[in-house]
Amino acid sequence: MSAEELVASPKLSKEEKKARKEAKKLKKAEKAAKEAAAQEGVATEEVKEEVRKKDKKDKKEKKDKKRKEVDQEEAESPSTSTAATEEPPKKKKKSKDADSSETPVSTATPTESETPALSKKQQKKLAKASAAAAATSSAAAIPAPTVPTTFTAEHNTFLTSNNITLTPSLFPPLLSIRDLPINSKLQPFLNKFEKPTPIQACSWPALLSKKDVVGIAETGSGKTLAFGVPGINLLSQLPPVTGSKKGRGQVPGQIQMLVLAPTRELAQQSHEHLSAFGEQVGLKSVCIFGGVGKDGQARELSQKDTRVVVGTPGRTLDLADSGELDLSSVSYLVLDEADRMLDAGFENDIRRIIAHTPGHKEGRQTVMFSATWPESVRRLASTFLNNPLRITVGSDELSANKRIEQIVEVLDNPRDKDFRLTHHLKAHLKVHPNSKTSPTRILVFALYKKEAQRLEYTIRRAGYAVGALHGDMTQEARFKALEAFKTGQQNVLVATDVAARGLDIPDVGLVINVTFPLTTEDFVHRCGRTGRAGKTGKAVTFFTGENHEKSLAGEFMRVLRDVGAEIPKEMDRFPTTIKKKEHGSYGAFYKETTNAPAPTKITFD
């Protein structure tokens, strides 16, 4: 080989060839990725501008390189033969290698003509990578839950003033709604609230950190948003489930949040709140309950954007067992008013429903809210919750709302109830006149359906706009009566205990218990319809001591005493014995609250 050939086309070592080859591949891949991203519309204007500048730079470098090579050949051509005779070929080769190494490998950039066209397979991979990058960038817009971990003096004051107990004390309360680390699309909906309620402030940090929670708080404390905000936020970060439908049911794995409630009214109310909140991120909630046909509910479940289900245990289990409700991908489970559901005998249904969902090891987060913390609720929590944080607002014993003024009237004759009822209606409306802008709402409770019908007739005859809510009414009639009461078309509503718990009716100023309920728990929940969301209220209770009332007198007085209410002297004639709940196997127990000495055991010889 001549010296000219050696100079014109020097041989490169294997390492240098490999390095140049890798550099070219890297540049080509980088350029192709940027171009593909720009074509797909994923790249920003800055990336597109960078691609244009890079192309311009590549063309300029190519021209400079060619010009430099031409100049170098012209300069070296006269001395080629001399250099070949004076120096051995190996040294010349080495010298040329050294010259070529002066140009860094990293400057070897491919031109547009050198870039090979991407194959279909490469284009597919590139599109997939671009989509993943876009998803990552959109997910980055959702702030990760970063809740405070250190208790400050302000946190401790908040817990003490609201009588809150955290077991264990892992997460300080979140005192400002604006500090919520949630999807930015959800924040405007919450900005209309001034500050979180105590149960919300303590629940949100733990639930946003994906911990299981047991919340014990009075009715009307904002529990729906306490579990709803973290649940909807979690679903907004999960990808929607895609797939083919099974018959007339929904796409398998489509339902990701399930809320169980004890009554149709409470389920409907929670559904309305979650629907309004979920709309901000395109999530739809469906409410399922008995008393109406299943076909309409099954059609709603099959809609593409349905990812939240709120239902009563009976209908939920029915649809799950029939295969029309797939719960295999539920990642957020809520048991609302758990003690009420257990009291109503839904424990077996709840256990069977939970069996349709994934376990906590598969990532299911479980939330339980209750007004009390009895043994039955503790047992259920220990079975289905994973190391839960327990939040107690107030006492875990049965207690009434201290913001509600309690008035107890002991009546010798039950027939006096109608007269006293109309008296309190007239007195309350005189102080709080009804108007369209500020409607006055009065809730009257009866024990039985027939009594509710009679009271509705009595109140209407007295000249008041009144509606009713009881079990003999159709579901449509119940919805209409409830809506008329909420909007102020009817300012008096007569109800049985079917509406005593969980209903969020705004601004109920007065509750009248015409007949005392069968349990003190129901009494507390009846009264809880007023004095909600931090407001004050008033409850009037007629007590005759007949039938079941006498056995509940002791517990009733204990509840009144705990909230500092005045107990009429006429109550002294009733026994102070507190009857404990009846156990299925061991019957009822009694606790004597008097200071009388305990009986002495007598032994016979």
From Swiss-Prot:
Localization annotation: Nucleus, Nucleolus
EC code: 3.6.4.13
PANTHER family found in the cross-reference section: ATP-DEPENDENT RNA HELICASE DBP3
Motif range (DEAD box): 336-339
SUPFAM superfamilies: P-loop containing nucleoside triphosphate hydrolases
GO molecular function, one term: ATP binding
Reactions performed catalytically: ATP + H2O = ADP + phosphate + H(+)
Cellular component, GO, one term: nucleolus
Name listed for the protein in its UniProt record: ATP-dependent RNA helicase DBP3
Motif segment (Q motif): 175-201
Domain Helicase ATP-binding: 204-391
Keywords associated with the record: ATP-binding, Helicase, Hydrolase, Nucleotide-binding, Nucleus, Ribosome biogenesis, RNA-binding, rRNA processing
Protein source organism: Cryptococcus neoformans var. neoformans serotype D (strain JEC21 / ATCC MYA-565)
Major location (coarse): nucleus
Family that this chain belongs to: Belongs to the DEAD box helicase family. DDX5/DBP2 subfamily.
Residue ranges, compositional bias (Polar residues): 104-114
Lineage: Eukaryota, Fungi, Dikarya, Basidiomycota, Agaricomycotina
